[in-house]
């Protein structure tokens, strides 16, 4: 039976071949021959290659123009025209051999030259040596690190804290530790560069809202809510984060935290709060923007800050609930893969915290001086003050731009030089122009510390006024 069936199939095939149109047979034959040619033919023929003559080679070499190793840089670039500082950047700073009152360094509480902080750092140096020579997970954890984390958690009234060896890497590591590809981050358009790098590393979907504009943020949250309703399955695994600064580095303004907390609960998002500028500045005890507004620390999912401003040390920290902080010990790249904070800097930060707790009146003094300089800088012809009266870092921008960023920077730099010649050390706010997501206008940054006297504040304001008249008018 099987042989009969095979013969019948063969007969059908032959019959179909006879009945097929001629053009169909020709086309199939051509395709078969083409396939055979492709299988057995070489990709190229050696005899078809033609070598260039010596003359043609020389012509190609002469025509070739290599790309520059580095992009062209103006001779006026600040990196090529730097100031040389002799000694520590304390209240009085020596710049290019001239002593000035320091209005440029973020030494808000004046702890950089504090004898107690120096003594604590020196004692730690004698006990532990200079560095740890390893990350926290590889014999880089010293008892002083654990003491500092415990003190920070207690000071901020959170369950746990984690320290990083570099302030910039703190928030830049914390964001990608939680927010991943597919998650959505709503971030203020004035966010600092460290936040921007953290968002870039997270590969999340970034949605910018207008600076401190709660209505614009809610608009974006509503739009996302509508999108989530279209695809509930995807929405269930998509996390939503709101990333803001307590006191913005680029604008000197305080975030509207109470309204943000309301939106957090309404739209089921998480809040990451960067407090590098507000920690040790805002609040009755210097705990930052949460204390300033009287908001429970439990309403914020993660708080980060560096220790290079108010604490006059190096590094940064994150604090919050234990399960949130513990995750960073496994996923925070700046924590896992960087050498841990030198013990002497951890000891210095602990002593700085001791001083802050023993002398809470220092924050009221700083606030008063911030308000003083903010008022004194008003009404300078050609300049506008950007920042709130609570901010120890204010920006002076041109009232009217020349139309060229390079010329604006040059005018402001002439003012900085004029002030330096008069004994007032200022600096321009520096940005990586091509890297910034929303590049702020050029500005002179004025930094207030508790060490500056009222006479020095008035002198700085009058010197800036004179510089504006000399350069801008």
Curated annotation (Swiss-Prot):
PTM summary: Phosphorylation at Tyr-164 inhibits activity and promotes cell survival.
InterPro entries: Aminotransferase_I/II_large, AON_synthase_class-II, PyrdxlP-dep_Trfase, PyrdxlP-dep_Trfase_major, PyrdxlP-dep_Trfase_small
Biological process terms in GO annotation: ceramide biosynthetic process; positive regulation of lipophagy; regulation of fat cell apoptotic process; sphinganine biosynthetic process; sphingomyelin biosynthetic process; sphingosine biosynthetic process
Catalyzed reaction equations: L-serine + hexadecanoyl-CoA + H(+) = 3-oxosphinganine + CO2 + CoA; octadecanoyl-CoA + L-serine + H(+) = 3-oxoeicosasphinganine + CO2 + CoA; tetradecanoyl-CoA + L-serine + H(+) = 3-oxohexadecasphinganine + CO2 + CoA; dodecanoyl-CoA + L-serine + H(+) = 3-oxotetradecasphinganine + CO2 + CoA
Family according to the record: Belongs to the class-II pyridoxal-phosphate-dependent aminotransferase family.
Residue ranges that the UniProt entry lists as topological domain Cytoplasmic: 37-473
Function noted in UniProt: Component of the serine palmitoyltransferase multisubunit enzyme (SPT) that catalyzes the initial and rate-limiting step in sphingolipid biosynthesis by condensing L-serine and activated acyl-CoA (most commonly palmitoyl-CoA) to form long-chain bases. The SPT complex is also composed of SPTLC2 or SPTLC3 and SPTSSA or SPTSSB. Within this complex, the heterodimer with SPTLC2 or SPTLC3 forms the catalytic core. The composition of the serine palmitoyltransferase (SPT) complex determines the substrate preference.
Annotated region described as Interaction with SPTLC2, given as residue ranges: 1-66
Summary of activators and inhibitors of this protein: SPT complex catalytic activity is negatively regulated by ORMDL proteins, including ORMDL3, in the presence of ceramides. This mechanism allows to maintain ceramide levels at sufficient concentrations for the production of complex sphingolipids, but which prevents the accumulation of ceramides to levels that trigger apoptosis.
Pfam family, one: Aminotran_1_2
Organism encoding this protein: Cricetulus griseus
Lumenal side: 1-15
This protein's domain notes: The transmembrane domain is involved in the interaction with ORMDL3.
Name of the molecule in the record: Serine palmitoyltransferase 1
